[in-house]
Each structure stands twice: as C-alpha cells, then as structure tokens.
C-alpha cells in the first residue's frame, strides 16, 4: 500500500479509510492512522488475512485489527481460524458497536440482547416516524440490515479454534520461514516477501513476485 496516495485520494466526501493487511503482512498503520487522525476519518482495518499479526504503533505493540476504529475477521475455512463460514466485526466505539449490531439484526433499532427486553425502559412510549405512538420499539427497523447471526454450533467451533489459535499462528510462521529459506537459492529470479517495518506478521500466504526475465507460468508449472 502506497500511503503517499492517501492525500491524493482525499476529497470532501471521504469519511473513512478501509485497508487490508494483505496476506497477513500489515500495511503502514502508523502513517494511515496519523492520516485518519489528521483528517478526522474512521479507520477500518480489513484484518481477514492477518488475525494474530502485531504492529508497533506509537511505541506500543498491538494486534492488527485493534488499532483502527473497526476491525474485521473472516472465519472461512482457509483463514487463520474457522467457524465454517462467517466472520466478525470488532470495535471499542459505542456508536459503531450499535450500528454494527443493528446491521447484523435486520436493521433493528432496538439494541437489547436476545432474550432481554426493555432495557432502555421506553419500549412502548415513543413514536417512530409515522408509526403510531407506543409502537413496540423491539420491532422498529430504522436502517438497512441483514440476518448475519452465527449459530450456536458455529460459535462452539469458534471457541474450540480459539484454544488452538496460538499454535495455528506459530505453524504459519514456521511454514513461512521454511519456504523463505528454501527459495533464497533462487532470489536472483524471485522477489521474496519480507515483514513490514515494525510488524510481526501472522502469515496468510506467501507472495512470490517474478523478477524481469522470469516467467510466472514457469514458476506455477514447476
């Protein structure tokens, strides 16, 4: 990611920067975070490739996905951990938390957890748009949304995966080091990946870039 392009892309319509930690190798979070702070923008980290990666920002090492205003993860089978399908959105911001939960639950305006009603104490005493006064707030859908809740079985699989997750990350780093060492002999033909500055990647893939004179098809068919 060329962070120098951020200023060129900025306009009056810009509200957020969303960027991915491609293949587990973090982008320049310090530069992007500083840019977002300077221009009062949300920072959304697509952390689907990088669960378990770490980055040193402002002198403190943090997990990627926790530095921006929003982080995302994917639990599709090839990723660092799986629940069969689905993913997660995480944030420390109360407003973004409310918005994400609403979008997850069909755009529901009420934020009461499942099985708990009237936590706000105003379930039946307000008016919403042209709906009649006292309309049940639990069934007011004020925004667009989806039905994106995980099943209990998926959650159980996810909990089991979390227990094994540190070993998954360790194995991915081991495999990366093994591949890198094996391919150093042909580094005159290939550009091998290296960790971004100030980062400890949790690798999702191994990027190989062919140097001039080396055919991609030759590498693929080898």
Which residues make up each language-model segment?
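Active-site phosphate-binding strand-loop segment of PLP-dependent enzymes
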Residues: 1-98
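PLP-dependent aminotransferase class I/II
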Residues: 2-4, 8, 16-20, 29-31, ...
